[in-house]
Each structure stands twice: as structure tokens, then as C-alpha cells.
């Protein structure tokens, strides 16, 4: 006969990302980017777009965590040197996730990385600098 699985291991690929999920991801991103003096913020539009049907396949919390972890490892210092009002796009070539962001200097002089939106799109075009990565190194997990 057919075995019924105890848990749906692909559940998060269909489940929408909740505000509470994004809050946890933001805390994680804040912790790692604090090393280069950057605070991470998500816009309201980011939350709307993370669950958008145009992504074709749902963007998962683990993909967003990977996006921040890998972009920090490859571009953390570079991002911190871009300066106030700089705009760029973080691009994960493995998952085709793109995250346009802007850097703002707060009144306290801290740099804030504001993730404007997020989308899963192959060959994403932007006039801003594209910070791409593909390789996923497991040694820091």
C-alpha cells in the first residue's frame, strides 16, 4: 500500500510568509549586518510582494535567510561602503530571488538597508548595481 507522510515537508513552499516570519528574518539580518554597522528594515511593500502570485513559486523564509546570509558573506563590507542614498539589487542566482534596496543614513548616523521589495524573477533587469551570488557554502550553517 501507499504510505501517508506524517508531515508535509513542502508545506512552506505553499504557505504564505507571515509578518511574524519576516520579523524573525529581519532580526536575523540585523544581527549579521550589525558587524558592518547596518540596520535592516523591510517596507510594507516587501511583505506584500513576498507573497505575490507573480513569483510563480512561493518565496520561503529559508530562501530569504539564505539571501541575507550569502549577500552578507560576499558583499557585507562592500554594501557598508556604498553610502547614503545608494541603491542596488541583491540577486540570488540559485533561487532567482531579487531584492532591490536603498541605504539611508539615520539621524543617529547609522546606515539602514531598506529592502524595498522582493521577487522571484529570472534575468531581473535593473539600472542599479547588481550584487549577485550563486554558491551556497555550508560550512557556516
Task: Kindly give the residue locations of the regions a language model identified.
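Ribonuclease/tRNase effector modules and their secretory precursors
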Residues: 1-141
Amino acid at each position: 500500500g501507499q504510505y501517508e507522510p506524517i508531515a508535509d515537508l513542502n508545506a512552506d513552499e505553499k504557505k504564505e510568509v507571515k509578518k511574524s516570519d519576516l520579523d524573525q528574518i529581519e532580526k536575523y539580518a540585523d544581527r549579521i549586518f550589525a558587524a558592518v554597522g547596518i540596520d535592516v528594515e523591510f517596507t510594507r511593500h516587501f511583505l506584500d510582494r513576498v507573497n505575490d502570485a507573480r513569483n510563480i513559486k512561493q518565496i520561503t523564509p529559508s530562501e530569504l535567510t539564505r539571501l541575507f546570509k550569502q549577500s552578507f558573506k560576499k558583499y557585507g563590507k562592500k554594501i557598508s561602503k556604498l553610502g547614503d542614498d545608494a541603491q542596488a539589487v541583491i540577486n540570488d542566482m540559485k533561487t532567482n530571488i531579487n531584492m532591490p534596496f536603498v541605504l539611508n543614513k539615520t539621524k543617529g548616523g547609522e546606515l539602514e538597508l531598506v529592502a524595498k521589495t522582493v521577487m522571484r524573477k529570472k534575468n531581473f533587469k535593473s539600472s542599479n548595481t547588481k550584487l549577485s551570488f550563486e554558491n551556497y557554502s555550508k560550512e557556516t550553517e
